[in-house]
Swiss-Prot record:
Its main location: membrane. It holds the Pfam family LptD. It is found in: Cell outer membrane. Residues 1-39 form the signal peptide. Component of the lipopolysaccharide transport and assembly complex. Interacts with LptE and LptA. Belongs to the LptD family. InterPro entries: LipoPS_assembly_LptD, LptD, LptD_C. The keyword Signal applies. This is LPS-assembly protein LptD. It comes from the Bacteria. Residues 770-779 have a biased composition (Pro residues). Disulfide bonds: none annotated. Together with LptE, is involved in the assembly of lipopolysaccharide (LPS) at the surface of the outer membrane.
Amino acid sequence: MPPKPLFPNVFPGDGAPRKRRLALALLAVPGLVPAVSYAQLSGAAAQPQPLDSPWDLRLAPQLEDRPLKDGAKPAAFVIADHTSGTAEQDLAAKGSAELRRGDVVVKADAIHYDQDTDMADAYGQVRINNSGTSFAGPEAHLKIEANQGFMTAPKYHFNMTGGSGSAERVDMVDNERSVFVNGTYTACQCSTNPAWYIKGSRFDFDTGADEGTARNGVLFFQGVPIFASPWMTFPLSGERRSGLLPPTFAMNSSNGFELSLPYYFNIAPNRDLTLTPRIISRRGVMTEATFRYLSPSYSGTFTANYLPDDRLAHRNRYAIYWQHQQNFGGGFGGYVYYNKVSDTTYPEDLGSTNQFVNGTQTLYQQEAGLTYNNGPWSVLARYQHWQTLPPSIAPYSREPQLNVKYTKYNVGGFDFGAEADYSRFRITTADATEGDRIVFNPYIAYGVYGPGYFVVPKVQYHFASYDLNYLSSTTPNSPKRFTESIPTVSFDTGLIFDRSVRLFGQDFIQTLEPRLYYVYTPYRDQSNAPLFDSAESDFGLAEIYQPNTFVGNDRIADANRITAGLTSRFIDPRTGDERARFVIAQQYYFADQRVTLNSGQSAVQARHSDLIVGAALKLGSGFMSETAFQYNQNNNQLVKSSVGFGYSPGERRVINVGYRYTRSNTTLDNQPINQFLISAQWPLTRRLYAIGRFNYDLAGDRVVDGLVGLQYDADCWALGVGVQRAANGINSSGQQNSSTRVMMQLTLKGLSTVDNGLVSAFRAGVPGYTPLPPPPPPMSRFSNYE
């Protein structure tokens, strides 16, 4: 018996107009569409349907799939210029043929569909779309509902993720999995000549798992192979997936050429590990591991660097960083912060290779603690230790510390509270005083607040008890056990006036806010107390209204002074935004301050403090300015100044200019500062951005630090290059050493993103820096509806 012709010319509607093809095809094979056939034959079914009918149109925030009910079979729809077949058995269609069933759409010049086996054979300009994945090729054979079959010479596109490519053959395993033989893959959206692509002998794609695997894969960029691997995995979208990340490069003046090859392990949705072998040409191979974890009750990061047998230092080098936060519930918590390096020159030699260590860092905190916070109570119990590198002086460690705070507000108009602290201070420096200290600091205040004024009297008390188990040889006759009791009374008051003004054609609300702050603390001899945690407080607008000129609990300054200040603000009445602020303040002394930090210092003899002046402006078009001055009227000298300007008219457009000046002071043993700083991020073209930072020491006639970089943002890739000169350690004379490094970072959009320190350097060096934008999100599968 001769084979049955595939497209017999027996259908009477061959010459029907195009708009009638669908109806003719459905009438010819009614068994394929029982729901529609029943609607045509039954009068009741032809009546208007209720609102829950699946055929009704309704408003929806977004297009969504409507799955079939359990046991229901999707109907099959066929459109073609010519169709023929047997009811409920098979169908042949040719001429712009289309077959639709469920989520599957098949288009071709000719289609044969066997309903018994659910097998479709398509020939000539075949296009298959299934759940957002599109295939195009000359021939395909597919089981529609199971989505199992193959296509020759396919071109494919994942609408949900944006990936695409071609191959010699594709085998469709199910709705989510497919296997390509001798193919390519790219996430570039261009139709021809993608900037990057992966070529492999086999690709296994799983859109459900959002993962692709390439066998014998070679990564090409601009037609040049840059990486090869017998096996590589990569995400099909921006979601995290295990696999190789793009290599990163750097050049350092002390370490030579650096090449990093990171591999990312997506252990779980809330845990991941990045393992990075780093080849350092002059030193060897360093391995870095970064483990991150997150849960509703805890989170943290652990990073370790290890360099065996450093070829320059001739020893093993390592650095450890661990940060952990824990929530036990009920207000209880805990934390760990541990940072350690192997030796004193690690920051100078290898700080540029570690984002948690910089070249000038000399103090490494090692601390663990328990916390409790509930209402007015706040409790901290911790063990704190420091690793100190020269030339820094080791600070005291708290081994351990227990701190309890209680604070209540507006209890009958009163604010009151107390702080109790026990600390055992230890230090690694030889011949240094050590011991225990108990501190109790209660206070009570009564605030009266009105629409245009406030009055806040306050009484506080400082009690300290020392039990020293070792005395320094410089204080051999000091007592080991003693106590201190020091009261303090303060009175803070101010007025607030406002008026409407019009300046430069714009309406403002101007305020005038005079403020007086008086504090009295009697003199108590504190020369026996060691300096466990106390130091001179900075002097500025943030500190001028504080009762104590020292920080810490070992020194409470005697005081009989008043601070007078005046603030004026200009506020936009439409938005409430503060557009300008001007401040001037000064302290006036009724008695000399006799308490000093060290016994060898002389008492402060002055009638008034330096004058503090500050201003902040926020003008239109992104212009901002902040300025502060500290002026000594007795010597007619500028003690400190800080001037800063910022201009940011749009995204990735920012310019910062600053100047800092500090006059040297032999009493405070501080070094003079006279520095000029400029930093910027600005587009040179639509795709090319320049980044720069220049910090110049006018007094020393040297560059403190500098950064010059370029970033190019293409459609599916980005390239950044930067040259950075930064401080890298401190020499024996106390001066900073500098080193230069070159960094290059290539980002293949849609494949993976990793920062080798370039973006971090740009962000740290340029306030207001904005990274390049991410690639646009892939379109919904409904955007390319077939």
